[in-house]
Amino acid sequence: GDLGVELPLEDVPLVQKNAIELARRWAKPVIVATQVLESMIDSPRPTRAEASDCANAVLDGADAVMLSGETSVGKYPIDTVKTMARIIESTEEHGLNRVPPLGSKPRTRGGAITRAAVEIADQLDAACICTFTQSGDSARRLSRLRPKKPVFAFTPVESTLNYMSLFWGIRPLLVEFAEHTDTMTAQVDRKLLENG
């Protein structure tokens, strides 16, 4: 990919891992892209190395893995998407416990609150974690922690809804703006029932 153009080939794996770790530490979405399953431009199956690279991006903590030429000019765009989805789903199902935990203490109140929310959800065995956000900040912070519980992020802002779709493990839902927590709680109940 792009790192391979800028760096010696042997440096790419560690630089990519370090970049992903740094982005997670600062709660920034990170997308691994370019030539992920490149052989699928002409072949219905990826190489083992490509499948491993895709899985390793997940295990390193990337929020998303993106295709480009494989689907825009490739002969097998649907197979490519299905293959990538299978690799990611299998890796998440069997290997998420290998994603390195964030060892640093939260640097902000928002970081401390989201970490506490994840810990409380685990201790209480909550069915899910819900957050309201206009900017997407709380959802972004929750995503970096890779919680075991599903996270639903409610927002009245459509651009924030779209932005949050980049965050790992976040299920964004659009709701009307509400000033009072009673209204917000009713929105959570209604939206969760609507979405199963």
Question: Which stretches of residues belong to each language-model region?
Answer:
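Conserved alpha/beta-domain cores
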Residues: 1-17, 22-26, 30-34, 40-51, ...
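Glycine-rich phosphate-binding active-site loops on the catalytic face of alpha/beta enzymes
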Residues: 1-5, 54-77
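C-terminal helical cap(s) of enzyme catalytic domains, especially alpha/beta-barrels
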Residues: 16, 71-94
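Long, charged amphipathic helices and adjacent flexible linkers at domain junctions
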Residues: 25, 83-118
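Flexible, glycine/charged-enriched surface loops at secondary-structure junctions
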Residues: 33, 68, 93-103, 127, ...
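Phosphate-interacting basic helix/loop segments used at nucleotide- and nucleic-acid interfaces
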Residues: 112-126, 186-196
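Nucleotide-binding motor/catalytic cores of P-loop/tubulin-like NTPases across gene-expression machines
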Residues: 138-140, 146-184
